[in-house]
């Protein structure tokens, strides 16, 4: 019977050492000179590596969980040879950090993770962007509006109006909410100066306006007018003002997020607001203050004329009474200015009061005035401003204008069938709705089960996701309108207030809560992701937006991957 070999206590020797020791032992006459059968060795013990958690790189000794892979977007050695045609959102980087390796040589190297184990990598990323809030890439610098482009007379003297949908483009930049609204209004006015004015369109026909006021403040339900004669110059919420035939279209624009106007079903196609949609949002007309004050002044003058006629008949008596009062006026001495202890009146004032009382007693009794019917004050709507621009009243006897406000229709219109039923008033987002970004490491991470391997950037498997690091920052400025007025004279921003005499076309007031767009670096921990067992020396890193496009506004992209064993592959 074949006897088993005896070994010292400890870990079993390797298979190669046992096989090579058998002939030597037989030659020396060892008791174990019988030929040995190959022992059974489990598959997980077949390799002379440093362990199941070993990481082998090139000809170096195996390492144990000490390797970190750094993904850097602007390594100087990678720029000329790997990234000359790439940007910070789609780049190649060498993960072999030896200085004596060129990018070409590093691309031939690999980092091998022990294939008897399942490996994962803890992925942490740092992302920094420098994206303005108004730009073409994010569809935030354009919007469409339906405006009047022509006014003419037909052969039978009928007014013919022509409307067209026009696309307006804003200059790119990082603007506050107030400045963006001013630029939108300025784009409409510039189109009027270029097209509408040349075709007979009046200034009062500018039918699209973005504002921030509540035009119903000061509304009197009895007269149906805004009784102060002016609209309250206070910002409440961004608003859209339309004339008949006009409208705005945000189907391919994200500027509606800046205005705080959204759809209740945001995933439905199209976003167009027309004049007919704003039913119940007509802006009330202003009181004609000049006519009202003139009517009151006429009543006063008529009353004064009647009294004057009575006094003229007794002009001699009036002169005599005045002369008597002058004669009775005492000569003031030095003690007349002393203040007594029981009253604040001086002696001179007391004497003067006594003289006036004596003069009234000496004057003849005044004739009783004949009461006349008092004239009612004139209360009528203001039809035009001081520059003869019409306020577009619905009719001569109406107290409402043809202008319709989205804000008024939303708050005062029918909530069941009006604009409130399918639009939503929300907080203005000066970032115009920041989207998400996706991280892809196609050469390092195993493809998730929901993706398949591909070479197209727009279809790279996604291994991480985060919000675009662009935030809306708000602060309170109680003197916003005052600052706006000062800047109008110092920075010459009166170009945004081309019609200051018109209460509707005037520049909208700045809100007290000012919001700006800010790029804030983001540090994100994406958790543990499954790694490939063989990692190439050159890795591709791709950051795509919600439409799976590389983002040119990525300013810095860093990634750190820490490999570790997740579980055994052979158990």
Swiss-Prot record:
The keyword Phosphoprotein applies. GO terms for molecular function: structural molecule activity. Interacts with the fiber protein (via N-terminal tail region). Interacts with the capsid vertex protein; this interaction binds the penton base to neighboring peripentonal hexons. Interacts (via the cell attachment site RGD) with host heterodimer ITGAV-ITGB5; this interaction promotes virus internalization. Interacts with host WWP1 and WWP2. This is Penton protein. It comes from Human adenovirus C serotype 2 (HAdV-2). Major capsid protein that self-associates to form penton base pentamers, each in the shape of a pentagon, situated at the 12 vertices of the pseudo T=25 capsid. Involved in virus secondary attachment to host cell after initial attachment by the fiber protein. Binds host integrin heterodimer ITGAV-ITGB5 (alphaV-beta5) thereby triggering clathrin-mediated endocytosis of virions. Mediates initial virus attachment to CXADR-negative cells. Binding to integrins ITGAV-ITGB5 also seems to induce macropinocytosis uptake of the virus. It comes from the Viruses. It is found in: Virion; Host nucleus. Keywords: Capsid protein, Clathrin-mediated endocytosis of virus by host, Host nucleus, Host-virus interaction, Late protein, Phosphoprotein, T=25 icosahedral capsid protein, Viral attachment to host cell, Viral penetration into host cytoplasm, Virion, Virus endocytosis by host, Virus entry into host cell. Pfam families: Adeno_Penton_B. Residues 298-324, 347-383 are annotated as: Disordered. All late proteins expressed from the major late promoter are produced by alternative splicing and alternative polyadenylation of the same gene giving rise to non-overlapping ORFs. A leader sequence is present in the N-terminus of all these mRNAs and is recognized by the viral shutoff protein to provide expression although conventional translation via ribosome scanning from the cap has been shut off in the host cell. Its main location: virion. Residues 314-324, 356-368 have a biased composition (Low complexity). The cell attachment RGD motif is exposed at the virion surface and is involved in binding to the integrin heterodimer ITGAV-ITGB5. The keyword GTP-binding does not apply. A motif (Cell attachment site) lies at residues 340-342. The modification Phosphoserine is found at residue 455. InterPro entries: Adeno_Penton_B. One of its GO terms (cellular component) is T=25 icosahedral viral capsid. Residues 303-313 have a biased composition (Gly residues). Belongs to the adenoviridae penton family. GO terms for biological process: clathrin-dependent endocytosis of virus by host cell; virion attachment to host cell. Induction: Expressed in the late phase of the viral replicative cycle.
């Amino acid at each position: 019977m074949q006897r088993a070999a005896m070994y010292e206590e400890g870990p079993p020797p390797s298979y190669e050492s046992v096989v090579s020791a058998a002939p030597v032992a037989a030659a020396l006459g060892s008791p174990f000179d019988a030929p040995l059968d190959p022992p059974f060795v489990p598959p997980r013990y077949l390799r002379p590596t440093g362990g199941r958690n070993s990481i082998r790189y090139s000809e170096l000794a195996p390492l144990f969980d000490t390797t970190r892979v750094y993904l850097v977007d602007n390594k100087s050695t990678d720029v000329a040879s790997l990234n000359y045609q790439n940007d910070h959102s789609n780049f190649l980087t060498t993960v072999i950090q030896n200085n004596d390796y060129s990018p070409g040589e590093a691309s031939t190297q690999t980092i091998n993770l022990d294939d008897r184990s399942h490996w994962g990598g803890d992925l942490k990323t740092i992302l920094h962007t420098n994206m303005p809030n108004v730009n073409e890439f994010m569809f935030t610098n354009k919007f469409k509006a339906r405006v009047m482009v022509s006014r003419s007379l037909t052969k039978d003297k009928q007014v013919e109006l022509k409307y067209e949908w026009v696309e307006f483009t804003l200059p790119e930049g990082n603007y506050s909410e107030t400045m963006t609204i001013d630029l939108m209004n300025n784009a409409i006015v510039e189109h009027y100066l270029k097209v509408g004015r040349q075709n007979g369109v009046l200034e009062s026909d500018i039918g699209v306006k973005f504002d921030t006021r509540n035009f119903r403040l000061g509304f009197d339900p009895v007269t149906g007018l805004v009784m102060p004669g002016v609209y309250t110059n206070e910002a409440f919420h961004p608003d859209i003002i339309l004339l008949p035939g006009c409208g705005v279209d945000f189907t391919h624009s994200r500027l509606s997020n800046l205005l705080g106007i959204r759809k209740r079903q945001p995933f439905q196609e199209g976003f167009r607001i027309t004049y007919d949609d704003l039913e119940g949002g007509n802006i009330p007309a202003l009181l004609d203050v000049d006519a009202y004050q003139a009517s009151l002044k006429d009543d006063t003058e008529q009353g004064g004329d009647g009294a004057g006629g009575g006094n003229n008949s007794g002009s001699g008596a009036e002169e005599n009474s005045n002369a008597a009062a002058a004669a009775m006026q005492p000569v003031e001495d030095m003690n007349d200015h002393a203040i007594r202890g029981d009253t604040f009146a001086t002696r001179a004032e007391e004497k003067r009061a006594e003289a006036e009382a004596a003069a009234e007693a000496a004057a003849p009794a005044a004739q009783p005035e004949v009461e006349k019917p008092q004239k009612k004050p004139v209360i009528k709507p203001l039809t035009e401003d001081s520059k003869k621009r019409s306020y577009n009243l619905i009719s001569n006897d109406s107290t409402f204008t043809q202008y319709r406000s989205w804000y008024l229709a939303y708050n005062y219109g029918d909530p069941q069938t009006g604009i409130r039923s399918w639009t939503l008033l929300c907080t203005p987002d000066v970032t115009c709705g920041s989207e998400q970004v996706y991280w892809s490491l196609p050469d390092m991470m195993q493809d998730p089960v929901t993706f398949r391997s591909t070479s197209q950037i727009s279809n790279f498997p996604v291994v991480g996701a985060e919000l675009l690091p662009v935030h809306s920052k708000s602060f309170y400025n109680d003197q916003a309108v005052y600052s706006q007025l000062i800047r109008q004279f110092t920075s010459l921003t009166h170009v945004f207030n081309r019609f200051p005499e018109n209460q509707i076309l005037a520049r909208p007031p700045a809100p007290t809560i000012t919001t700006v767009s800010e790029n804030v670096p983001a540090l994100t921990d994406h958790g543990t992701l499954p790694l490939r067992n063989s990692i190439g020396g050159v890795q591709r890193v791709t950051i795509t937006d919600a439409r799976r496009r590389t983002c040119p506004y990525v300013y810095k992209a860093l990634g750190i991957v820490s490999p570790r064993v997740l579980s055994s592959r052979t158990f």
